[in-house]
Swiss-Prot record:
This is Putative DNA-directed RNA polymerase subunit omega. It comes from Guillardia theta. Keywords: Chloroplast, DNA-directed RNA polymerase, Nucleotidyltransferase, Plastid, Transcription, Transferase. It catalyses: RNA(n) + a ribonucleoside 5'-triphosphate = RNA(n+1) + diphosphate. May be involved in RNA polymerase activity. Transmembrane segments: none annotated. It holds the Pfam family RNA_pol_Rpb6.
Amino acid sequence: MKKKYLSVNSNYVLYKTEELLDAASNRYKITVQIANRAKRRRYEDIDLLEEVTLKPIVRAVLEMAEEISQPEIISD
């Protein structure tokens, strides 16, 4: 069964990704953090019966970009 995802403006996602990378001191570390969050979210969403609205990687990028005002999350 193929999951249906909500369409998100790709330019907005790219902008938020660049915002995250600019704020991070280590690009590799923030990339790994995003991947781990997306992976964790993917396995959490398996248990949910409702439809998933965003792909896990996109959701992780957008969530972390929103949390950019909290520097302790990025500097971990």
